[in-house]
Amino acid sequence: QHLVDLTGGLGVDFSFMAPLFAQATYVEQQPQLCQLAAHNMPLLALPHARIVNADATQHLTQLAPDSASLIFIDPARRSATGRKTVLIEDCQPDIITLAPSMLKAAPVVVVKLSTMLDIAAAVRALGCVSQVHIVATAGECKDLLLVITRQAKAQGGTNPLITATNMLPDGTIGGSLTFTPQDEANATPPIAAQPLRYIYEPGPAIMKAGAFKTTALHYQLQKLHTNTHLYTADHLVPDFQGRTFELKATYTFGKAQLKALRSVTTQANLAVRNFPASVDSLRKRLKLRDGGPYYIFATTLADGTHALLLCERV
């Protein structure tokens, strides 16, 4: 079992993976980081770590076929001008160009990417992706990993297993959803005629994964509208990956309805979902202060009605 990390950097990822392998090679082009790694690895109880000062592309040419069990690579995600990239083609080193060589040296390659990257475009460009992992914590996507394999390459690699995971502060898994792009394309979730007792807002990992229809089927929920990524049900889902709210009232935009809303509260946390206005403009119109125990979702319902859902967190 041999791990090769082609972009060792500070060695954080390497130090977590290396104990799982009998051999572990850290590759880094910056001499200073290699010196730091050589000092730190014995202190981290990783005496088997081999430090190589080389460019990732250069070292890859020296790897014999099947000389590694797993290759890990974390390419730079900024362009020459310093702008963050959203396409895998813009990462350095060029993962698409290196993929055949990496898969020749190892049967499995794990690519760590920016959560800003376009997942579907990356899957199409590589054509050898078997798994996609999106990890969120504290309400924010933190990691995006692509697993590319020889087997996926032989099969076309364009319908990978996508797993969206929410990690809790204590390091445990707070929810996980696995599906394929084909599952999402074929899914036909029920659409609610009206909002029900509970409103469900999917977490960032699910949103990044694009599991908009699959989420409804997985948790036995109904969508509020085909293009509204909010869900509803009369039952409480304890392990829902996202935020859960109890619906207190539904208002439309008639004068009497808005007056009734303001008689209940003049302060709320406001969000828009599939709605033709920004939060700022809507807040001014509704004359609502920010914060408080109430949450209001401005959204579009199944019949096309624009509505305000007054909720409280569960």
Model-derived regions, located:
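SAM-dependent transferase fold signal centered on methyltransferase-like domains
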Residues: 1-314
